[in-house]
A protein has these predicted regions:
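Active-site core segments that coordinate phosphate-bearing ligands/cofactors
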Residues: 1-156, 161-258
């Protein structure tokens, strides 16, 4: 089990049943507050490029004299992405606002790359940017899933990526090839989690563990939804990622050109 956070940056934390076979530069070993061994994959970039494009589309509508509520704009554009091809139809996006150690970049250049015959639609464009927000995290996670054969039963998703119902959850499920559970508090950030830890330290009863405190007092009665990965989405994400990795030299060349 574990959790995945997706906002300005992203990370996954997978609770391990045993130690990994060897150290990996892309994976940090940490522990939960109660001492369980955790493998952590951290990425510097996630939703910043998505946010920039949503703002641009908002500016476009305002140019026609139409001001759209920001939450509605996000919802419309995110849901549009689900109409796109599972592999994004030949449209590849790189969301690098900053460097990304997992892919060997010391700086970032947001990019969109497509072939002349790509199916360049709004749906594929938005889907490629949602995939891009998860792609680097998936590269790191694939070490755990495919090389270390770590079994992930489910992941708890939180962060702004999940604010629009279903969409981010479905994309993350495809990328991680695992069920993603999102609770009503999913869009809350790290400050909320730190406040919960502080409350536990102040209120815990003798012998009470963090796990029982969370299950019995914080999340008891909370509603949430779980989405299973859709096979077509998983296959499409894998195809997108292969093209993403194949075209990474273009991103690196853009960084090198300053």
């Amino acid at each position: 089990t574990g959790n995945v956070s997706a906002g300005t940056s992203s990370f996954s934390m997978i609770v391990l049943e045993k130690e990994l076979s060897k150290p990996y530069e892309m994976i940090d070993m940490v522990t939960t507050p109660d001492g369980s061994l955790v493998a952590m994959v951290h990425c510097n970039n996630c939703t910043s490029d998505l946010n920039a494009w949503v703002n641009l589309f908002g500016e476009c509508t305002e140019s026609f004299g139409v001001k759209v509520d920001k939450n509605e704009l996000y919802g419309v554009l995110y849901r549009k992405a689900l109409e796109g091809a599972a592999d994004c139809g030949g449209v590849t996006a790189y969301n690098y606002f900053s460097g990304e150690p997992i892919t060997g970049l010391d700086a970032g250049r947001p990019m969109v790359v497509r072939t002349p015959d790509a199916d360049f639609t709004l749906a594929n464009f938005m889907r490629s940017h949602l995939y891009s927000a998860v792609a680097t995290l998936k590269i790191g996670m694939d070490i755990l899933l495919k090389e270390e054969h770590v079994a992930v039963d489910s992941l708890m998703g939180h962060g702004g990526f999940f604010k629009t119902p279903v969409v981010g959850q479905r994309v993350m499920a495809a990328g991680m090839n695992a069920p993603i559970t999102v609770m009503d508090t999913a869009s809350e950030g790290g400050a909320w989690g730190m406040a919960i830890l502080a409350a536990f330290m102040k209120e815990k009863e003798t012998g009470e563990t963090l796990s029982s405190y969370l299950n019995d007092k914080i999340f008891a009665g909370q509603t949430g939804t779980t989405l299973q990965p859709e096979p077509e989405d998983v296959k499409g994400f894998e195809a997108f990622l292969e093209e993403y990795k194949r075209l990474l030299p273009a991103e690196k060349a853009a960084v090198a050109a300053k």
